[in-house]
């Protein structure tokens, strides 16, 4: 709930999946079209994410890039990977230990909406940060 409060009004949705927390960042607020550099206007939001990740430091962080199905599979796969790495790199620059993070591009393989409409394609273009507790073995 601290995370929700921190990210209120940023355009990022926060959902819980079991013990994991998923931050969904729509690409229209995070990146320019077909680009992998984080928009400077999105830095304050990522700074807020970093503050929370530093506080909850017994977690593993998966940064997952996703695209819609427009264009070639290879291009989308590559773009989603670069976007995930871009977000992970920014968080690393904010003091998040890179060893806690993985960045993976999934291209169009995990849609959350239909690619038949622009609204659906827009939902599919996203970066998700999944935060999972480190379990003691």
Describe the predicted segments one by one:
Residues 64-136:
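Periplasmic OmpA-like peptidoglycan-binding domain that tethers envelope proteins to the cell wall
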Residues 1-21:
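Membrane-engaging insertion elements
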């Amino acid at each position: 709930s601290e995370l929700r409060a921190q990210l209120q009004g940023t355009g990022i949705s926060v959902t819980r999946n079991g013990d994991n927390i998923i931050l969904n960042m729509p690409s229209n607020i995070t990146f320019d079209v077909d680009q992998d550099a984080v928009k400077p206007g999105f830095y304050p939001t990522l700074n807020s994410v970093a503050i929370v990740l530093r506080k909850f430091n017994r977690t593993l962080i998966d940064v997952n890039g996703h695209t819609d199905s427009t264009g070639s599979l290879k291009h989308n796969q590559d773009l989603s990977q670069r976007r995930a790495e871009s977000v992970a790199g920014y968080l690393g620059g904010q003091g998040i230990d890179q060893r806690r993070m993985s960045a993976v591009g999934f291209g169009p393989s995990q849609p959350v909406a239909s690619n038949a409409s622009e609204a659906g394609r827009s939902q599919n273009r996203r970066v998700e940060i999944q935060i999972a507790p480190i379990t003691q073995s």
